Amino acid sequence: MRILQRALTFEDMLMVPRKSSVLPKDVSLKSRLTKNIRLNIPFISAAMDTVTEHKTAIAMARLGGIGIVHKNMDIQTQVKEITKVKKSESGVINDPIFIHAHRTLADAKVITDNYKISGVPVVDDKGLLIGILTNRDVRFETDLSKKVGDVMTKMPLVTAHVGISLDEASDLMHKHKIEKLPIVDKDNVLKGLITIKDIQKRIEYPEANKDDFGRLRVGAAIGVGQLDRAEMLVKAGVDALVLDSAHGHSANILHTLEEIKKSLVVDVIVGNVVTKEATSDLISAGADAVKVGIGPGSICTTRIVAGVGMPQVSAIDNCVGVASKFDIPVIADGGIRYSGDVAKALALGASSVMIGSLLAGTEESPGDFMIYQGRQYKSYRGMGSIGAMTKGSSDRYFQEGVASEKLVPEGIEGRVPYRGKVSDMIFQLVGGVRSSMGYQGAKNILELYQNAEFVEITSAGLKESHVHGVDITKEAPNYYG
Protein backbone atom coordinates (compact mmCIF):
# COMPACT_ATOMS: atom_id res chain seq x y z
CA MET A 1 0.00 0.00 0.00
CA ARG A 2 1.36 3.41 -1.03
CA ILE A 3 0.08 6.35 1.00
CA LEU A 4 1.65 9.46 -0.50
CA GLN A 5 0.76 12.03 2.13
CA ARG A 6 -1.67 13.12 4.79
CA ALA A 7 -4.16 15.37 3.00
CA LEU A 8 -6.09 18.26 4.55
CA THR A 9 -9.03 20.43 3.61
CA PHE A 10 -10.23 23.86 4.74
CA GLU A 11 -11.91 22.72 7.96
CA ASP A 12 -8.76 20.88 9.08
CA MET A 13 -6.80 24.09 9.62
CA LEU A 14 -6.82 27.68 10.81
CA MET A 15 -4.52 30.63 10.21
CA VAL A 16 -2.68 32.03 13.22
CA PRO A 17 -3.22 35.78 13.80
CA ARG A 18 -0.17 38.03 13.62
CA LYS A 19 0.77 41.47 14.91
CA SER A 20 -0.93 43.92 12.56
CA SER A 21 -1.28 47.60 11.79
CA VAL A 22 -3.37 46.85 8.69
CA LEU A 23 -7.05 47.78 8.66
CA PRO A 24 -9.40 45.59 6.56
CA LYS A 25 -10.67 48.62 4.62
CA ASP A 26 -7.13 49.43 3.47
CA VAL A 27 -6.13 46.08 1.95
CA SER A 28 -5.85 45.43 -1.79
CA LEU A 29 -7.58 42.39 -3.25
CA LYS A 30 -6.10 42.79 -6.73
CA SER A 31 -4.90 39.52 -8.19
CA ARG A 32 -4.56 37.59 -11.46
CA LEU A 33 -6.89 35.30 -13.35
CA THR A 34 -4.19 34.13 -15.75
CA LYS A 35 -0.61 35.00 -16.58
CA ASN A 36 -1.84 38.05 -18.52
CA ILE A 37 -5.28 38.97 -17.11
CA ARG A 38 -5.78 40.91 -13.90
CA LEU A 39 -8.62 40.75 -11.40
CA ASN A 40 -9.69 43.48 -9.00
CA ILE A 41 -11.16 40.90 -6.63
CA PRO A 42 -10.08 37.22 -6.59
CA PHE A 43 -13.48 35.72 -7.39
CA ILE A 44 -14.65 33.72 -10.42
CA SER A 45 -18.13 32.34 -11.00
CA ALA A 46 -18.07 28.68 -12.02
CA ALA A 47 -18.70 27.41 -15.55
CA MET A 48 -21.87 25.56 -14.51
CA ASP A 49 -25.28 25.64 -16.15
CA THR A 50 -27.00 26.69 -12.92
CA VAL A 51 -24.38 29.33 -12.07
CA THR A 52 -23.01 31.37 -14.97
CA GLU A 53 -24.62 32.81 -18.06
CA HIS A 54 -24.46 36.46 -19.12
CA LYS A 55 -26.31 37.93 -16.13
CA THR A 56 -23.96 36.37 -13.58
CA ALA A 57 -20.92 37.17 -15.74
CA ILE A 58 -21.92 40.84 -16.04
CA ALA A 59 -22.48 41.12 -12.30
CA MET A 60 -19.14 39.47 -11.50
CA ALA A 61 -17.14 41.67 -13.89
CA ARG A 62 -18.79 44.86 -12.62
CA LEU A 63 -17.65 43.96 -9.11
CA GLY A 64 -14.07 43.32 -10.27
CA GLY A 65 -14.11 39.55 -10.75
CA ILE A 66 -15.07 37.48 -13.78
CA GLY A 67 -17.66 34.92 -14.83
CA ILE A 68 -17.03 31.81 -16.93
CA VAL A 69 -19.99 31.04 -19.21
CA HIS A 70 -20.73 27.30 -19.24
CA LYS A 71 -20.67 25.19 -22.41
CA ASN A 72 -23.94 23.25 -22.04
CA MET A 73 -25.32 25.04 -25.11
CA ASP A 74 -24.62 25.14 -28.80
CA ILE A 75 -21.77 27.30 -30.09
CA GLN A 76 -24.02 30.07 -31.40
CA THR A 77 -25.84 30.42 -28.08
CA GLN A 78 -22.60 30.53 -26.10
CA VAL A 79 -21.25 33.17 -28.49
CA LYS A 80 -24.43 35.22 -27.93
CA GLU A 81 -23.91 34.98 -24.17
CA ILE A 82 -20.36 36.30 -24.54
CA THR A 83 -21.55 39.07 -26.86
CA LYS A 84 -24.19 40.16 -24.34
CA VAL A 85 -21.48 40.60 -21.72
CA LYS A 86 -19.16 42.43 -24.11
CA LYS A 87 -21.90 44.78 -25.31
CA SER A 88 -23.38 45.40 -21.86
CA GLU A 89 -21.10 48.39 -21.42
CA SER A 90 -18.10 49.95 -23.06
CA GLY A 91 -15.86 52.92 -22.61
CA VAL A 92 -16.11 53.57 -26.33
CA ILE A 93 -18.21 51.24 -28.45
CA ASN A 94 -15.83 50.65 -31.36
CA ASP A 95 -18.28 48.62 -33.43
CA PRO A 96 -21.61 50.34 -32.76
CA ILE A 97 -24.87 48.95 -34.03
CA PHE A 98 -26.22 51.18 -36.83
CA ILE A 99 -29.12 51.33 -39.26
CA HIS A 100 -29.71 52.77 -42.75
CA ALA A 101 -32.20 55.55 -43.44
CA HIS A 102 -34.29 53.46 -45.86
CA ARG A 103 -35.08 50.84 -43.21
CA THR A 104 -38.41 50.98 -41.36
CA LEU A 105 -39.15 51.76 -37.73
CA ALA A 106 -40.16 48.11 -37.38
CA ASP A 107 -36.63 47.12 -38.40
CA ALA A 108 -35.21 49.58 -35.89
CA LYS A 109 -37.42 48.16 -33.13
CA VAL A 110 -36.07 44.67 -33.80
CA ILE A 111 -32.52 45.99 -33.40
CA THR A 112 -33.17 48.00 -30.24
CA ASP A 113 -35.15 45.16 -28.63
CA ASN A 114 -32.56 42.54 -29.55
CA TYR A 115 -29.57 44.49 -28.24
CA LYS A 116 -31.52 46.25 -25.47
CA ILE A 117 -30.43 49.70 -26.59
CA SER A 118 -32.42 52.93 -26.62
CA GLY A 119 -31.17 54.43 -29.84
CA VAL A 120 -29.09 53.77 -32.93
CA PRO A 121 -26.91 55.90 -35.28
CA VAL A 122 -28.07 56.19 -38.89
CA VAL A 123 -25.52 55.96 -41.71
CA ASP A 124 -25.57 56.04 -45.50
CA ASP A 125 -24.17 53.36 -47.80
CA LYS A 126 -20.63 54.74 -47.34
CA GLY A 127 -20.83 54.63 -43.54
CA LEU A 128 -21.19 58.41 -43.21
CA LEU A 129 -23.19 59.52 -40.18
CA ILE A 130 -26.41 61.20 -41.32
CA GLY A 131 -28.50 61.12 -38.15
CA ILE A 132 -29.49 59.26 -35.03
CA LEU A 133 -32.71 57.51 -34.05
CA THR A 134 -33.48 57.86 -30.35
CA ASN A 135 -36.33 57.08 -27.98
CA ARG A 136 -37.57 60.64 -28.27
CA ASP A 137 -37.87 60.29 -32.04
CA VAL A 138 -40.07 57.20 -31.93
CA ARG A 139 -41.90 57.58 -28.61
CA PHE A 140 -45.22 58.67 -30.13
CA GLU A 141 -44.89 56.96 -33.52
CA THR A 142 -47.56 54.32 -34.16
CA ASP A 143 -46.87 53.66 -37.85
CA LEU A 144 -43.90 51.29 -37.81
CA SER A 145 -43.79 51.21 -41.62
CA LYS A 146 -42.34 54.71 -41.68
CA LYS A 147 -38.77 55.08 -42.89
CA VAL A 148 -36.05 55.73 -40.33
CA GLY A 149 -34.84 58.69 -42.39
CA ASP A 150 -38.21 60.44 -42.02
CA VAL A 151 -38.23 60.22 -38.23
CA MET A 152 -34.59 60.40 -37.13
CA THR A 153 -32.80 63.45 -35.73
CA LYS A 154 -30.81 64.63 -38.74
CA MET A 155 -27.34 66.13 -38.99
CA PRO A 156 -25.81 68.35 -37.77
CA LEU A 157 -25.40 66.42 -34.52
CA VAL A 158 -23.05 66.85 -31.60
CA THR A 159 -20.18 64.47 -32.42
CA ALA A 160 -16.63 63.83 -31.29
CA HIS A 161 -13.50 62.75 -33.10
CA VAL A 162 -11.58 59.51 -32.60
CA GLY A 163 -9.34 59.67 -29.54
CA ILE A 164 -11.59 61.69 -27.24
CA SER A 165 -11.23 60.70 -23.59
CA LEU A 166 -14.19 59.56 -21.50
CA ASP A 167 -13.81 62.60 -19.25
CA GLU A 168 -13.93 64.93 -22.26
CA ALA A 169 -16.90 63.01 -23.65
CA SER A 170 -18.71 63.29 -20.32
CA ASP A 171 -18.21 67.06 -20.26
CA LEU A 172 -19.43 67.38 -23.86
CA MET A 173 -22.55 65.29 -23.22
CA HIS A 174 -23.33 67.26 -20.06
CA LYS A 175 -22.91 70.58 -21.88
CA HIS A 176 -25.27 69.63 -24.72
CA LYS A 177 -27.63 67.49 -22.59
CA ILE A 178 -27.34 64.43 -24.84
CA GLU A 179 -27.24 60.73 -23.98
CA LYS A 180 -25.36 59.43 -27.02
CA LEU A 181 -22.19 60.81 -28.56
CA PRO A 182 -21.24 59.45 -32.01
CA ILE A 183 -17.51 59.20 -32.75
CA VAL A 184 -16.52 60.09 -36.32
CA ASP A 185 -13.32 60.48 -38.33
CA LYS A 186 -12.33 63.54 -40.36
CA ASP A 187 -14.63 62.40 -43.20
CA ASN A 188 -17.62 61.99 -40.86
CA VAL A 189 -17.52 58.18 -41.08
CA LEU A 190 -19.04 56.58 -37.97
CA LYS A 191 -16.24 54.99 -35.91
CA GLY A 192 -17.75 54.59 -32.47
CA LEU A 193 -20.30 55.61 -29.90
CA ILE A 194 -20.21 56.73 -26.27
CA THR A 195 -23.38 56.54 -24.18
CA ILE A 196 -24.25 58.27 -20.92
CA LYS A 197 -25.22 54.84 -19.56
CA ASP A 198 -21.65 53.60 -19.91
CA ILE A 199 -20.26 56.71 -18.23
CA GLN A 200 -22.72 56.31 -15.35
CA LYS A 201 -21.74 52.65 -14.95
CA ARG A 202 -18.09 53.67 -14.86
CA ILE A 203 -18.91 55.83 -11.84
CA GLU A 204 -21.21 53.25 -10.24
CA TYR A 205 -18.73 50.36 -10.64
CA PRO A 206 -15.25 51.87 -10.25
CA GLU A 207 -13.62 48.45 -9.70
CA ALA A 208 -15.16 46.84 -12.79
CA ASN A 209 -12.90 44.34 -14.56
CA LYS A 210 -12.56 45.61 -18.13
CA ASP A 211 -10.49 44.90 -21.21
CA ASP A 212 -8.42 47.41 -23.17
CA PHE A 213 -11.55 48.60 -25.01
CA GLY A 214 -13.50 49.34 -21.84
CA ARG A 215 -15.68 46.23 -22.15
CA LEU A 216 -16.39 43.89 -19.26
CA ARG A 217 -14.17 40.82 -19.17
CA VAL A 218 -15.68 37.35 -19.52
CA GLY A 219 -14.47 33.78 -19.92
CA ALA A 220 -16.02 30.72 -21.54
CA ALA A 221 -15.71 26.98 -21.03
CA ILE A 222 -14.83 24.58 -23.83
CA GLY A 223 -14.27 20.84 -23.98
CA VAL A 224 -11.74 18.48 -25.51
CA GLY A 225 -11.32 18.90 -29.26
CA GLN A 226 -13.67 21.89 -29.50
CA LEU A 227 -11.38 24.08 -31.60
CA ASP A 228 -14.27 25.40 -33.70
CA ARG A 229 -16.03 26.55 -30.53
CA ALA A 230 -12.80 28.14 -29.29
CA GLU A 231 -12.34 30.04 -32.56
CA MET A 232 -15.89 31.42 -32.52
CA LEU A 233 -15.57 32.50 -28.89
CA VAL A 234 -12.28 34.28 -29.55
CA LYS A 235 -13.87 36.11 -32.51
CA ALA A 236 -16.69 37.18 -30.18
CA GLY A 237 -14.12 38.78 -27.88
CA VAL A 238 -13.85 36.28 -25.04
CA ASP A 239 -10.99 37.15 -22.69
CA ALA A 240 -10.06 33.64 -21.57
CA LEU A 241 -10.99 30.06 -22.40
CA VAL A 242 -11.41 27.42 -19.70
CA LEU A 243 -10.50 23.98 -21.00
CA ASP A 244 -12.70 22.09 -18.61
CA SER A 245 -12.41 18.45 -17.59
CA ALA A 246 -12.95 16.38 -14.46
CA HIS A 247 -9.43 15.02 -15.08
CA GLY A 248 -7.20 17.72 -16.48
CA HIS A 249 -4.12 15.50 -16.48
CA SER A 250 -5.15 13.49 -19.53
CA ALA A 251 -3.64 13.12 -22.98
CA ASN A 252 -6.65 14.62 -24.77
CA ILE A 253 -6.60 17.74 -22.60
CA LEU A 254 -2.88 18.25 -23.17
CA HIS A 255 -3.29 17.78 -26.92
CA THR A 256 -6.24 20.18 -27.13
CA LEU A 257 -4.34 22.78 -25.09
CA GLU A 258 -1.35 22.58 -27.43
CA GLU A 259 -3.62 22.93 -30.48
CA ILE A 260 -5.38 25.99 -29.05
CA LYS A 261 -2.14 27.73 -28.11
CA LYS A 262 -0.73 26.95 -31.55
CA SER A 263 -3.69 28.36 -33.51
CA LEU A 264 -5.26 31.10 -31.34
CA VAL A 265 -4.06 34.13 -29.41
CA VAL A 266 -5.98 33.73 -26.16
CA ASP A 267 -5.26 32.88 -22.54
CA VAL A 268 -6.27 29.34 -21.60
CA ILE A 269 -7.12 28.13 -18.10
CA VAL A 270 -6.84 24.35 -17.76
CA GLY A 271 -8.04 21.88 -15.14
CA ASN A 272 -8.94 20.25 -13.01
CA VAL A 273 -5.85 18.78 -11.36
CA VAL A 274 -4.50 18.13 -7.85
CA THR A 275 -0.88 16.97 -8.26
CA LYS A 276 2.53 18.50 -8.88
CA GLU A 277 3.11 16.37 -11.96
CA ALA A 278 -0.20 17.41 -13.53
CA THR A 279 0.53 21.08 -12.89
CA SER A 280 3.97 20.78 -14.46
CA ASP A 281 2.63 19.02 -17.56
CA LEU A 282 -0.14 21.58 -18.10
CA ILE A 283 2.28 24.48 -17.80
CA SER A 284 4.68 22.80 -20.23
CA ALA A 285 1.80 22.44 -22.71
CA GLY A 286 1.04 26.17 -22.50
CA ALA A 287 -1.50 26.70 -19.71
CA ASP A 288 -1.88 30.34 -18.66
CA ALA A 289 -3.52 29.32 -15.37
CA VAL A 290 -4.13 25.99 -13.64
CA LYS A 291 -7.47 25.11 -12.04
CA VAL A 292 -7.28 22.93 -8.96
CA GLY A 293 -9.87 20.63 -7.42
CA ILE A 294 -11.14 17.09 -7.92
CA GLY A 295 -14.19 16.31 -5.86
CA PRO A 296 -14.42 19.20 -3.33
CA GLY A 297 -17.65 20.69 -4.68
CA SER A 298 -20.87 20.34 -2.69
CA ILE A 299 -22.65 18.66 -5.61
CA CYS A 300 -19.70 16.50 -6.75
CA THR A 301 -19.61 12.75 -6.04
CA THR A 302 -16.37 11.89 -7.88
CA ARG A 303 -14.53 10.95 -4.69
CA ILE A 304 -17.32 8.56 -3.70
CA VAL A 305 -18.20 7.15 -7.13
CA ALA A 306 -14.63 6.84 -8.43
CA GLY A 307 -12.68 6.83 -5.17
CA VAL A 308 -10.41 9.50 -6.63
CA GLY A 309 -9.49 13.03 -5.57
CA MET A 310 -7.64 14.97 -2.92
CA PRO A 311 -8.74 17.26 -0.07
CA GLN A 312 -8.58 20.79 -1.38
CA VAL A 313 -5.98 22.37 0.91
CA SER A 314 -3.38 19.73 0.04
CA ALA A 315 -4.33 19.93 -3.64
CA ILE A 316 -3.78 23.70 -3.69
CA ASP A 317 -0.48 23.34 -1.85
CA ASN A 318 0.73 20.70 -4.33
CA CYS A 319 -0.10 22.75 -7.40
CA VAL A 320 1.08 26.12 -6.10
CA GLY A 321 4.44 24.57 -5.26
CA VAL A 322 5.03 24.00 -8.97
CA ALA A 323 3.07 26.84 -10.59
CA SER A 324 4.73 29.55 -8.50
CA LYS A 325 8.11 28.63 -10.01
CA PHE A 326 6.75 29.53 -13.45
CA ASP A 327 4.68 32.54 -12.31
CA ILE A 328 1.48 30.79 -13.39
CA PRO A 329 -1.66 31.55 -11.33
CA VAL A 330 -3.56 28.78 -9.58
CA ILE A 331 -7.36 28.87 -9.28
CA ALA A 332 -8.89 27.05 -6.30
CA ASP A 333 -12.07 25.50 -7.69
CA GLY A 334 -14.57 24.03 -5.24
CA GLY A 335 -15.07 23.42 -1.56
CA ILE A 336 -15.68 27.07 -0.66
CA ARG A 337 -18.42 27.35 1.97
CA TYR A 338 -17.38 30.47 3.85
CA SER A 339 -15.27 33.58 3.30
CA GLY A 340 -12.70 32.06 5.64
CA ASP A 341 -12.18 29.27 3.12
CA VAL A 342 -11.42 31.88 0.46
CA ALA A 343 -8.83 33.50 2.73
CA LYS A 344 -7.21 30.12 3.43
CA ALA A 345 -7.03 29.32 -0.31
CA LEU A 346 -5.36 32.68 -1.04
CA ALA A 347 -2.98 32.23 1.89
CA LEU A 348 -1.97 28.86 0.43
CA GLY A 349 -0.97 30.60 -2.81
CA ALA A 350 -4.08 30.45 -4.98
CA SER A 351 -4.51 33.64 -7.02
CA SER A 352 -8.29 33.35 -7.08
CA VAL A 353 -11.17 31.08 -6.15
CA MET A 354 -13.98 29.70 -8.29
CA ILE A 355 -17.41 29.79 -6.67
CA GLY A 356 -20.37 27.55 -7.52
CA SER A 357 -22.94 26.83 -4.81
CA LEU A 358 -22.76 30.25 -3.12
CA LEU A 359 -23.57 31.99 -6.42
CA ALA A 360 -26.10 29.40 -7.62
CA GLY A 361 -28.61 30.84 -5.17
CA THR A 362 -28.35 34.39 -6.48
CA GLU A 363 -30.89 36.31 -8.51
CA GLU A 364 -28.67 36.42 -11.61
CA SER A 365 -27.93 32.68 -11.81
CA PRO A 366 -29.76 30.73 -14.56
CA GLY A 367 -31.10 28.08 -12.17
CA ASP A 368 -34.84 27.68 -11.65
CA PHE A 369 -36.46 29.58 -8.78
CA MET A 370 -38.61 27.53 -6.40
CA ILE A 371 -40.39 27.69 -3.06
CA TYR A 372 -40.18 24.72 -0.70
CA GLN A 373 -41.90 24.67 2.68
CA GLY A 374 -42.30 28.43 2.55
CA ARG A 375 -38.63 29.17 1.81
CA GLN A 376 -37.07 30.42 -1.43
CA TYR A 377 -34.54 28.28 -3.30
CA LYS A 378 -32.83 28.02 -6.67
CA SER A 379 -31.90 24.82 -8.45
CA TYR A 380 -28.25 23.76 -8.44
CA ARG A 381 -26.63 20.76 -10.05
CA GLY A 382 -23.19 19.39 -10.67
CA MET A 383 -21.92 19.24 -14.23
CA GLY A 384 -21.47 15.52 -13.58
CA SER A 385 -25.16 15.05 -12.78
CA ILE A 386 -27.42 13.13 -15.16
CA GLY A 387 -29.32 16.31 -16.06
CA ALA A 388 -26.20 18.30 -16.89
CA MET A 389 -24.51 15.47 -18.80
CA THR A 390 -27.54 14.94 -21.04
CA LYS A 391 -27.38 18.66 -21.85
CA GLY A 392 -23.77 18.54 -23.01
CA SER A 393 -21.23 18.09 -20.20
CA SER A 394 -20.77 14.32 -20.57
CA ASP A 395 -17.44 14.88 -22.37
CA ARG A 396 -16.11 16.45 -19.16
CA TYR A 397 -16.43 12.99 -17.59
CA PHE A 398 -15.24 11.05 -20.66
CA GLN A 399 -18.75 9.79 -21.48
CA GLU A 400 -19.49 11.71 -24.68
CA GLY A 401 -21.93 9.87 -26.94
CA VAL A 402 -23.16 7.56 -24.18
CA ALA A 403 -26.94 7.07 -24.03
CA SER A 404 -28.58 8.88 -21.10
CA GLU A 405 -29.66 5.64 -19.45
CA LYS A 406 -26.04 4.41 -19.54
CA LEU A 407 -24.41 7.50 -18.03
CA VAL A 408 -22.50 7.06 -14.78
CA PRO A 409 -22.99 10.35 -12.92
CA GLU A 410 -20.36 12.03 -10.75
CA GLY A 411 -22.67 14.70 -9.39
CA ILE A 412 -26.15 15.32 -8.06
CA GLU A 413 -29.04 17.72 -8.64
CA GLY A 414 -30.41 19.75 -5.76
CA ARG A 415 -31.40 23.18 -4.51
CA VAL A 416 -29.69 25.94 -2.54
CA PRO A 417 -31.22 28.79 -0.53
CA TYR A 418 -31.99 31.96 -2.44
CA ARG A 419 -29.29 34.49 -1.48
CA GLY A 420 -30.28 37.74 -3.20
CA LYS A 421 -28.08 39.47 -5.74
CA VAL A 422 -24.56 38.48 -6.75
CA SER A 423 -23.37 41.79 -5.33
CA ASP A 424 -24.77 40.89 -1.89
CA MET A 425 -22.93 37.56 -1.81
CA ILE A 426 -19.65 38.97 -3.11
CA PHE A 427 -19.85 41.83 -0.59
CA GLN A 428 -19.91 39.32 2.27
CA LEU A 429 -17.11 37.20 0.80
CA VAL A 430 -14.91 40.23 0.13
CA GLY A 431 -15.58 41.54 3.63
CA GLY A 432 -14.54 38.24 5.19
CA VAL A 433 -11.29 38.12 3.21
CA ARG A 434 -10.50 41.72 4.13
CA SER A 435 -11.06 40.87 7.79
CA SER A 436 -8.73 37.86 7.51
CA MET A 437 -6.00 39.99 5.95
CA GLY A 438 -6.35 42.47 8.80
CA TYR A 439 -5.76 39.66 11.30
CA GLN A 440 -2.72 38.61 9.28
CA GLY A 441 -1.24 42.07 8.85
CA ALA A 442 -1.29 41.56 5.08
CA LYS A 443 -1.79 44.62 2.87
CA ASN A 444 -2.26 42.53 -0.26
CA ILE A 445 -2.74 38.93 -1.38
CA LEU A 446 0.98 38.37 -1.97
CA GLU A 447 1.76 39.36 1.63
CA LEU A 448 -0.99 37.04 2.85
CA TYR A 449 0.66 34.15 0.98
CA GLN A 450 4.14 35.03 2.18
CA ASN A 451 3.27 35.57 5.85
CA ALA A 452 0.41 33.21 6.71
CA GLU A 453 1.03 30.44 9.23
CA PHE A 454 -1.37 27.56 9.84
CA VAL A 455 -2.27 25.14 12.59
CA GLU A 456 -3.95 21.80 12.05
CA ILE A 457 -7.00 21.41 14.29
CA THR A 458 -8.87 18.44 15.75
CA SER A 459 -12.54 17.60 15.34
CA ALA A 460 -13.07 19.22 18.74
CA GLY A 461 -11.34 22.35 17.45
CA LEU A 462 -13.65 22.42 14.44
CA LYS A 463 -16.69 22.02 16.67
CA GLU A 464 -15.45 24.89 18.83
CA SER A 465 -14.92 27.03 15.72
CA HIS A 466 -18.57 26.81 14.69
CA VAL A 467 -21.54 28.23 16.55
CA HIS A 468 -22.22 25.93 19.51
CA GLY A 469 -24.40 25.75 22.59
CA VAL A 470 -27.00 28.16 21.23
CA ASP A 471 -30.02 28.14 18.91
CA ILE A 472 -29.68 30.65 16.08
CA THR A 473 -32.75 32.90 16.08
CA LYS A 474 -31.68 35.26 13.29
CA GLU A 475 -29.58 34.06 10.40
CA ALA A 476 -26.39 35.90 9.49
CA PRO A 477 -25.81 36.64 5.78
CA ASN A 478 -22.37 34.98 5.83
CA TYR A 479 -22.85 31.93 8.07
CA TYR A 480 -24.84 28.88 7.04
CA GLY A 481 -24.35 26.50 9.97
Question: Language-model segments: which ranges?
Answer:
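Alpha/beta catalytic cores of nucleotide-metabolism and tRNA/nucleoside-modifying enzymes
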Residues: 1-21, 161, 285, 307-332, ...
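Active-site-adjacent beta->alpha loops and helix N-cap segments on the catalytic face
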Residues: 25, 73-83, 141-145, 189-209, ...
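Glycine-rich phosphate-binding active-site loops on the catalytic face of alpha/beta enzymes
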Residues: 62-77, 186, 238-250, 288-306, ...
